[in-house]
């Protein structure tokens, strides 16, 4: 496009060489005008291509790819949360660079309520030219003096005033309060500032001033301020969009996707810096000759090409270039371009906005053009208005394509079928232009139909928005401190775990010697573990709840085959007479034998009986009390093996050889011991927790004999009932204990097992909610409900992908409304509770394996532990944490953990077979 030189006339003057008014337009002029306007038409395909290209560039930048170099920067702003309406307090804002040669100081009061949520007062200070061009220290000292002067006018307490700094110059931000100036713009040329942390320079100046105690909390750009400053609605505002002199957007990205952060959890606000976007294949086809001319005339040709098609600084200039071209071709103004029209930047954004107004636009066209020394005809005014519409429509559509890329990014990264989000809008193009937002909305709906978007005008992003960033940062810091203080008692040191290990060793020794101890150390009369030679067919019974299992276990060389049948125990049987219960059990056994073709055979039988018993022999167990909803009369205080044998006798013609009554923990050890002869410990971590191990018989005071081994049922859930664990207990443990059916008992179990961990978490969440840290401080009935937070939720939450989707789903199903910060904190609470549980369990295992090693006088011990229980098996980190703790506390022991397969069935059968083997050996 040919360069156009101004003729040197003043605005308002007309060139005397211009053709006379009223001369008709040359033929074909309307077609020529249409041709020029057509250049600004952007097709849906082109918009989709721009959307895809920008999205690709965004993702490249997020990943830190530099080849090919992405055309957008995707800068982390270190703003990690959006407002949730409870922010309150007084905040200072210093705004420098947003309004040219002046700075603004604001006092913003946030009330934390929906009504009158924000109150502000402000003062503007003109920056002298010698300060703008002087030393950097002089500028920041001036800013500090302005802060003091502003505060002097109001009665404020000089106690840690929180300040947000809006510094509108290109910076490299490395933290919320760390930002290095890249280069000055907007006429500022202060020496000694470029390459320096401007937040620190401001802090130093405030300290030199020495008048007020001001804490600079956050450095914020105007786009982020726009997002943070919008009114709270029914959906989260997680996108900020500025179309002012320039254009930019920011949004809340998953932190794990931002390579520059190297973080896994939470979100961070990313400033896209999309004004620099350029892709020849996508953007090239929509660039016009007028865009090229504008770029050539700009201060930095070739840069910010996308911004130069959208930003308010350029829209008026694009309109001017089109009008000049049309006039030079005789289409407008009788072929006459006035000197003012030929002058760069003579048409501004405010002119374009007024001329395009549907109601008063034509009148404004005449006013603006006459001010440029032109005398437009009616047809000229109409065409000028069409030019304005074409330029601005394209700008809105291009902006929409970029916004659609951001929305698509949000939707796909969060794996949401429909994204519901609010976009905060700010800038004079939105404020002044009547149609820009309408076109933007319509185009976004076409380009991102899967996104449900509401647009909310931001109120004073540079002031209120910066204050809100500061308030949110202060809130997060306070909440983080409270969370850490709350969870600190759950962070067990190596010294604490070593103490637990030592206390358990002492309790084990006292229990074995028959002295007073919280560990009962019960002999199980299982004297050996499998040696791999076990063969044969066995029956096993498993009674531990409302379902009862009968199993046929076939042990062959290298394999164990299990066939089982589940039978229900009706409530009237479970709570009727003992005779009726055991008759029902025998009926089930007989039915199973018929189904398996075993009628008339007398197979050795092992009985897993998961109720509290005092065992007097391998086949003698006195029921202490019923649990789990059973209350059959005439059983407590009786030998349950005897009751079973009596039921068999009553049935007649049934031959069953009851060899052993088996505890489920022992069954777990024996089940794993068949595959690994080194397995000498059993561990259950499920609804409850317990452990057993092979002790030297000489150490068991209650059983005569000096040689051989005896499996000891530790009943370690009661460890600490003597008060030895009181130093580890928290107020949350105390609340759970007091609400339990057995206050003061099973203290170790209540800190470890699945029955209680969810309740501990629930009490912590209640506490944090009461302090306003979680769920906006809003207490809900669901959190007040006992056992509403299932322990399985811990496994699901801690198994969650990095997006914390499972956390949100679980809590929302419970009726809780939460933010991403809430989800992250709930995850941390779950991790703290389950980590402590695993570490305590590990300390217990370490005590046992060290006891085995010292019993045998070994320098090094290699031993395996058979493990069962839903918490151990299903929790994603529990088993690893147990193993790590054991390695730290028992470094001389090499411990392998084996997950048991059907300890109640296979284990009971193996106990039975080992007992038979030992009996046969004794006979020989």
Swiss-Prot record:
Q: Report residue spans for region: Hexokinase small subdomain 1.
A: 84-220
Q: Where does ATP 1 bind?
A: 95-102, 438-439
Q: Which residues bind D-glucose 2?
A: 610-611, 627-628, 663-664, 689-690, 715, 749
Positions annotated to bind ATP 2: 542-547, 687, 754-755, 791-795, 870-874
Question: What ranges does the record give for the region Hexokinase large subdomain 2, renumbered to this chain?
Answer: 663-902
Transferase found in the keyword field: yes
Read off the InterPro entries from this record.
ATPase_NBD, Hexokinase, Hexokinase_BS, Hexokinase_C, Hexokinase_N
Query: What is the recorded name of this protein?
Result: Hexokinase-3
Q: Which gene encodes it?
A: Hk3
